[in-house]
A protein has these predicted regions:
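Amphipathic alpha-helical packing segments from all-alpha helical-bundle domains
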Residues: 118-144, 153-157, 184-187, 191
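Hydrophobic alpha-helical connector segments
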Residues: 75-104, 155-159
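Amphipathic C-terminal alpha-helical segment
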Residues: 97, 136, 140, 160-178, ...
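Short hydrophobic/aromatic patch on the recognition helix
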Residues: 41-52
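Short secondary-structure transition hinges
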Residues: 96-136, 175-176, 180
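Pre-recognition alpha-helix immediately N-terminal to the DNA-recognition helix
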Residues: 15-23, 69, 89, 93
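Amphipathic alpha-helical linker/stalk segments
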Residues: 3-6, 64-89, 119-130, 139
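Basic, helix-initiating cap at the start of DNA-binding domains
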Residues: 1-27, 31-36, 40, 56-60
Length: 199
């Protein structure tokens, strides 16, 4: 008896995006040139343009894939935990991402990109699945009387900006702590912000 095994073979476009993402994760977005990606994939420098009209289109595809992957796992750490446990679970997800893949974090969250999401418009109504997970928790906290009534988007921005600012300082070498101690600093600082917005 013969069994057929079907293996999904990535398309050339997927291979190109995979190679660009690999370079970006390991070296940063500046290193992800069309020529370098083409060499890794094994296509000519001109052939890559059949799949992506320019470098920005390729980087946009990488960003969309990365955000999609992040949103699939974001917030699953303590799905049945208390409100506060879920908030800190999201913070841990964020820190795992930012500290574990700093080049990708920088590309997605802080580098200027033409198609990058902009606050507030692109963050409303689930426009950013990662940010949106915390917006939903903030709205829940307000409904349940845990947080003062306020603009959920702006409260979420206050919470995320604190952690992002600390990460920027840490990745820039401006905070002289090991990772474990830095994570504790992030938790304490987030708790201080939460204490300021509690009902």
């Amino acid at each position: 008896m013969v069994y057929a095994v079907y293996v999904s073979v990535p398309s050339t476009a997927e291979k190109i995006a995979d190679a660009a993402e690999d370079i970006l994760v390991n070296e940063g977005s500046d290193a992800a040139t069309m020529r370098r990606v083409a060499e890794i994939v094994g296509v000519s420098a001109m052939a890559i343009y059949k799949y992506f009209p320019n470098r920005q289109a390729l980087l946009d595809a990488v960003a969309a894939r990365a955000f999609r992957r992040l949103s699939e796992a974001w917030g699953t750490r303590v799905p049945d935990g208390s409100w506060e446990e879920r908030v800190f679970g999201l913070m841990d997800d964020f820190l795992d991402f930012a500290l574990g893949r700093p080049h990708l974090y920088t590309f997605l969250m802080t580098e200027q990109r033409p198609r990058a999401r902009r606050f507030p418009g692109d963050f409303q109504g689930g426009g950013s699945p990662v940010f949106g997970a915390l917006v939903l928790l903030v709205e829940e906290g307000m409904r349940d009387g845990l947080l003062r009534e306020d603009d959920p988007l702006e409260v979420t921005l206050a919470l995320t900006s604190t952690a992002q600012g600390l990460v920027q300082l840490y990745l820039g070498g401006r905070i002289g702590l090991d990772e474990e101690t830095f994570r504790l600093l992030c938790a304490r600082t987030t708790r201080r912000v939460l204490d300021g917005i509690r009902a």
